[in-house]
């Protein structure tokens, strides 16, 4: 019997080749309970062998609070410890401002579109 994919509250997961594409479905990541759910769900994905390459698409998200940004940074750091790579795409202008303030692009590759991010996985690994 094949194992069914996990059901998530905040994420939609799709494999594109060997890349786990994670669409964050929430419009806002404002509250601590959302950050906790995001941490749990992204943690489940990023710890898997099949998610050695993970693309987090924030295109639907209009607002990210500081706690959720901390979660995203933690996911990148944990993935690196596992030898995995995380990239981001689709940041709206408001989310991009916050990402720039916390220095997300110093820890992970941030691309405008999913296609650009997927193409970047085929190139050399991101070096900090």
Functional labels for PLM-detected ranges:
Residues 18, 93, 115:
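Residues that form or immediately flank small-molecule/cofactor binding pockets and catalytic motifs
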Residues 22-26, 45, 122-123:
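Short regulatory "switch" loops immediately downstream of catalytic or recognition motifs
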Residues 28-108:
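Amphipathic alpha-helical interaction surfaces in cytosolic regulatory modules
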Residues 12-22, 55-67, 121:
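Charged, low-complexity, helix/coiled-coil-prone segments
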Residues 108-117:
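Short acidic-hydrophobic, aromatic-tinged amphipathic segments that line or gate anion-handling sites
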Residues 3-40:
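STAS-typified acidic loop motif
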Residues 116-128:
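Short, charged, intrinsically disordered terminal tails
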């Amino acid at each position: 019997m094949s194992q069914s994919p996990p059901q998530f509250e905040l994420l939609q997961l799709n494999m594109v080749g060997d890349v786990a594409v994670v669409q964050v479905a929430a419009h806002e990541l404002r509250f601590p309970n959302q950050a906790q759910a995001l941490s749990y769900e992204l943690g489940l994905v990023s710890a898997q062998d099949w998610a050695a390459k993970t693309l987090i698409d924030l295109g639907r998200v209009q607002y990210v609070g500081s706690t959720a940004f901390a979660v995203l940074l933690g996911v990148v750091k944990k993935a690196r410890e596992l030898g995995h790579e995380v990239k981001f795409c689709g940041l709206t202008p408001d989310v991009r401002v916050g990402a720039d303030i916390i220095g997300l692009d110093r820890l992970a590759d941030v691309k405008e579109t999913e296609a650009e991010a997927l193409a970047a996985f085929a190139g050399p690994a991101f070096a900090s």
